[in-house]
């Protein structure tokens, strides 16, 4: 598809028709076609054929009457059931208006009998024929065998898909081999490649046509717009614009497509003012066109480009989905690394203790981004979604770790080029003098491009509440870069919910960009015990049961008590301690107490310490580690 949204590039005759196998072509009512060049035709068939041709308004035996297409279509449909091996019957049915893929397949398969019935009823040469849709802007008239094969190929391609494209191309290639200068065959070949997104082939096929002085104005107009579009899809904007500069012409739908393509090429050239003028004129003339409306309202709506080399690298030449992305093509191992990143992200998420709702939200986020990218690749409408996130919750609940998981997911899906996450705080962004904050913020953002910027305690940027706080400058700078680098930057802000809400209210642009929230609840006491057990296990340590019981009581007490934070706000004591972060500190400090205890035991230096003694953390080790930790946090130390 041409653009990142639902394809509105008008292509005629793209209704949902079923592809027909060559072996099934010509079947109607379960009867198979047997094509024969010299067959004595039944007199009743000739008579009925003559009647049907008169209904088409053709001169039969030099006699003619007004056309009745409904009667002609009904008559030819009935006649095809008994004379299914006669191409002229199928041609008549197409002339009466049935140019469906099965009918065109039958015409193609019985082409060597074409003319037999026409001669019997003395039709003028080329009197019996039909118009068919090429699938892009133009209609051709079919009167001979090569026309019939071409019509079937065009109809087959209109059904879409790698199989039909390949079969249609095989038919047309055979015709071009016999008649290399036939423009109609080259046009249908170009349409097949256009539909399959083989833009470099479209350019090769149409360049001779668009420069041919002998073709009519409509043909030239259609070829010019299609060629300009193909060049734009290849990222060759300057030559594309040379064909799209004056998109008006006799083919109305091509004129609209050309004008929209021109606007998007101008946008790609960063000439948004000119692009907007073209789009406004288009919208005034076509207010119901969804693509024009979206392109006008969304400046990120643009052309998705590729290269001839990437097209040639498809594993299936007719399937755009097998085309490697930019990173995959430059680095063939990139696809494998993306799969590894997604696997790592899923593994890390599964290993998290608790946080069931957080895990669910991250899984939904992954699905949302994955399907958004698939829809974009298919040319379907994709609503503009910001991928920035709000992680709301107390310290130590896994926000930073989950941010790393999200970075892996985004990179693994191809939304970001890197899995890097740059964690920053107020001090990293704020300067002391005018102009310094903007420079520092831009430098930090530059270092985070193509990855994730994780702004912890984001509300600290405006904590003073002063109007001249440099934090407001940092926010304005961040918002501008989030817009200008929207395809290269994902920002995650983290902190307490109430504080984040106040932060988002400080600038009207913040809430519109941070629309997705993931809430991180405080851990339950039993979850923290499980975390401690697992953390110790990973360090070749083990808590004795009495130590685990000691921890459970400690965590329960902290979870049910409250303590003022540094700003005087009453918070759960466990949140002040830092939840999972507090657990890590306990594990590390308890191991230090164990080492000190063993070092001063009677067994040290005698070689009699067992592995169990070297690994076991006792309740006394825990008690001795907890007291200084709690004092350092300003929390009450429990007493027996």
Swiss-Prot record:
Which Pfam families does the UniProt entry name for this protein?
AAA, AAA_lid_6, T7SS_EccA1_N
Could you say which residues bind ATP here? 393-400
Q: Which SMART domains match?
A: AAA (SM00382)
Location (main, coarse): cytoplasm
Its localization reads: Cytoplasm
* Key words, A-Z: ATP-binding, Cytoplasm, Nucleotide-binding
Q: What is this protein called?
A: ESX-3 secretion system protein EccA3
Tell me which species this is from.
Answer: Mycobacterium leprae (strain TN)
The opening ranks of the lineage are: Bacteria, Bacillati, Actinomycetota, Actinomycetes, Mycobacteriales
Q: Which gene encodes it?
A: eccA3
């Amino acid at each position: 598809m041409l653009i990142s949204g639902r394809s509105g590039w008008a292509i005629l005759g793209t209704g949902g028709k079923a592809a027909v196998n060559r072996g099934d072509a010509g079947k109607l009512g379960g009867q198979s076609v047997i094509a024969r060049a010299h067959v004595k035709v039944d007199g009743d068939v000739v008579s009925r054929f003559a009647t049907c041709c008169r209904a088409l308004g053709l001169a039969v035996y030099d006699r003619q009457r007004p056309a009745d297409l409904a009667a002609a279509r009904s008559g030819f449909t009935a006649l095809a059931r008994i004379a299914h091996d006669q191409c002229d019957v199928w041609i008549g049915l197409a002339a009466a208006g049935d140019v469906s893929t099965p009918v065109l397949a039958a015409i193609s398969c019985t082409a060597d009998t074409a003319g037999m019935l026409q001669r019997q009823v003395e039709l003028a040469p080329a009197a019996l024929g039909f118009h068919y849709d090429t699938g892009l802007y133009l209609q051709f008239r079919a009167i001979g065998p090569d026309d019939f094969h071409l019509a079937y190929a065009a109809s087959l391609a209109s059904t879409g898909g790698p199989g039909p494209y390949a079969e249609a191309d095989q038919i047309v290639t055979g015709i071009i081999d016999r008649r290399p200068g036939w423009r109609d065959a080259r046009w249908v070949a170009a349409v097949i490649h256009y539909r399959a997104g083989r833009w470099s082939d479209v350019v090769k096929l149409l360049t001779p046509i668009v420069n041919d002085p002998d073709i009519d104005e409509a043909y030239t107009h259609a070829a010019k717009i299609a060629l300009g579009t193909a060049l734009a899809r290849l990222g060759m904007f300057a030559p594309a614009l040379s064909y799209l500069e004056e998109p008006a012409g006799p083919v109305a739908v091509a004129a609209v497509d050309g004008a929209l393509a021109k606007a998007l090429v101008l946008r790609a050239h960063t000439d948004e003012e000119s692009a907007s003028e073209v789009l406004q004129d288009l919208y005034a003339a076509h207010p119901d066109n969804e693509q024009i409306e979206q392109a006008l309202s969304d400046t990120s709506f643009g052309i998705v480009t590729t290269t001839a080399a990437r097209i040639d690298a498809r594993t299936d030449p007719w399937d755009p989905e097998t085309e490697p992305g930019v990173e995959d093509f430059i680095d063939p191992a990139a696809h494998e690394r993306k799969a590894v990143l997604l696997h790592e992200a899923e593994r890390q998420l599964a290993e998290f203790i608790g946080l069931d709702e957080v895990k669910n939200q991250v899984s939904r986020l992954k699905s949302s981004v994955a399907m958004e990218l698939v829809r974009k690749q298919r040319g379907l409408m994709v609503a503009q979604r910001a991928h920035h996130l709000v992680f709301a919750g107390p310290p130590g609940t896994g926000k930073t770790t989950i941010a790393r998981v999200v970075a892996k997911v985004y990179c693994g899906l191809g939304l970001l080029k890197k899995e890097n996450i740059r964690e920053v705080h107020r001090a990293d962004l704020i300067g002391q003098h005018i102009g310094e904050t903007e420079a520092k913020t831009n430098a930090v953002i530059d270092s985070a491009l193509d990855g994730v910027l994780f702004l912890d305690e984001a509300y600290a940027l405006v904590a003073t509440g002063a109007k001249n706080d440099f934090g407001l400058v940092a926010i304005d700078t961040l918002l501008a870069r989030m817009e200008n680098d929207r395809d290269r930057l994902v920002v995650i802000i983290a902190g307490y919910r109430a504080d984040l809400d106040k932060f988002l209210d400080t600038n009207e642009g913040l809430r519109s960009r941070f629309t997705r929230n993931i809430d991180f609840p405080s851990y339950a006491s039993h979850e923290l015990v499980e975390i401690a057990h697992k953390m110790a296990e990973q360090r070749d340590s083990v808590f004795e049961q009495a130590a685990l019981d000691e921890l459970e009581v400690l965590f329960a007490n902290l979870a049910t008590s409250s303590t003022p934070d540094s700003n005087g706000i009453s918070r759960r004591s466990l949140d002040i301690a830092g939840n999972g972060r507090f657990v890590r500190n306990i594990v590390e400090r308890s191991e230090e107490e164990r080492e000190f205890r063993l070092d001063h035991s009677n067994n040290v230096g005698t070689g009699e310490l067992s592995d169990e003694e070297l690994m076991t953390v006792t309740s006394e080790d825990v008690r001795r580690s907890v007291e200084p930790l709690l004092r350092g946090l300003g929390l009450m130390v429990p007493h027996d």
